[in-house]
Amino acid sequence: MSTTIRSNSKKKKMTLLQAIERVVELSEDSKMSQEFMKKAKAEIQLLAKSYGITERQVVLFCVCMEKGPNRVDYHDIASHLDMNKISVLGHASDIDALMHRRLLKYRDVKDEDDFDIPAVVIRSLKHNEIWGRFS
């Protein structure tokens, strides 16, 4: 499946990985600001619609993809976004939602601070497919 998004009045085909990469690039040191969200709007909306998740969850998922696939934690996310860890912990419910969608998994059931990207998610992205299509 190839996805199409509009960019500067031109249609541009973009894979899911390309959209994730763009969000990662634009989100670095962004503090998830409105300016960043506006710049990455097309990619964020594409991913949100594809995975059935919120825009904030898209950003967190993309950062986890960049920092993973193994042993991602709240500090990694905070460092990438240039936020303090407490602010990122405020988005724990979004991380939980990504777990529910099976886009992330806890590294250890006893430790909810570390998480991984499941191999099946990475494999599906390599083929530009959406893992766990939800209605």
Predicted regions and their residues:
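Intrinsically disordered, low-complexity N-terminal extensions of AAA+/P-loop NTPases
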Residues: M1-S135
